[in-house]
């Protein structure tokens, strides 16, 4: 199914890319430190420029994303050969 929030979108693209290690795993104020999987996905997505509305220390994992936003991020990841 199509993700409906930032957490789902980040996880989908990151997993499709093979779960690459981000250069730095950030501590976002709104992602539990125990949720390493999501912190890695969010950090990698931000590093790749795929989530450009991330605040300095806030990911907003439950922010609603539209189907169009998901498609645009998907296309950008494909264009940059991050996913196949």
Please annotate each region the language model reported.
Residues 1-10, 15-39, 52-64, 76-84:
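Feature responds to low-complexity, polar/acidic, surface-exposed segments characteristic
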Residues 49:
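Glycine-centered, phosphate/nucleic-acid-interacting loop/turn motifs that mediate DNA/RNA or nucleotide
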């Amino acid at each position: 199914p199509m993700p409906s929030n930032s957490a789902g979108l980040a996880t989908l693209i990151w997993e499709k890319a093979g779960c690459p290690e981000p250069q730095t795993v950030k501590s976002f104020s709104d992602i539990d430190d125990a949720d390493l999987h999501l912190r890695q996905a969010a950090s990698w997505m931000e590093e790749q420029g795929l989530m450009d509305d991330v605040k300095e220390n806030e990911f907003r994992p439950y922010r609603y994303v539209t189907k169009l936003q998901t498609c645009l991020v998907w296309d950008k990841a494909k264009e940059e050969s991050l996913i196949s």
